[in-house]
Amino acid sequence: ADRAHGGVRPVMPERAALVGAARVSIARGSKSFAAASTLFAAAVRERAWLLYAWCRACDDLVDGQDHGGERVAVTDAQRRVTRVRALSVAALAGAATGDPAFDALGVVAAETRMPPRYVHDLIDGFQLDADDWRPADEDDLYRYCYHVAGAVGCMMAIVMGVPPEEEATLDRACDLGLAFQLANIARG
């Protein structure tokens, strides 16, 4: 039995249900990402939605938001990151988590042979935020940008079909993630 779910183990939803929930998530959370995803072939588009749903759910859980909306005061950031990490680890192991966004991670990771390190690296970025960590120098800034965006660039490249072994291509995808995050910081 599973105490976190009232003694009942969650059942893995059908892939189509996860894709449907992920499609709703991206449509609600990011009109620009949703529009851009229409340029992909169906299989890549669905995987992009699955990855987005997980990233959005993690960010919202840690920040106390709903699809990037108004924040609520978060007094338990460490517990929230611990929960994100536990659900993500379970999803990567192929277990049903009881949360469609985390189950979506399990599906997209299995379908693409996603290296778990990128998932953990993004979660480490959430940990930096939970710790209220601030960069002290340029190297720290790049470190932060890697964790919150570069790792996502790598995961998105894999979703788009880059084999996980193609480090040079993944390095360029990481650079794009860093550039997006630096632009976000400069805009803010």
Predicted feature residues:
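Acidic catalytic motifs of isoprenoid enzymes
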Residues: 2-186
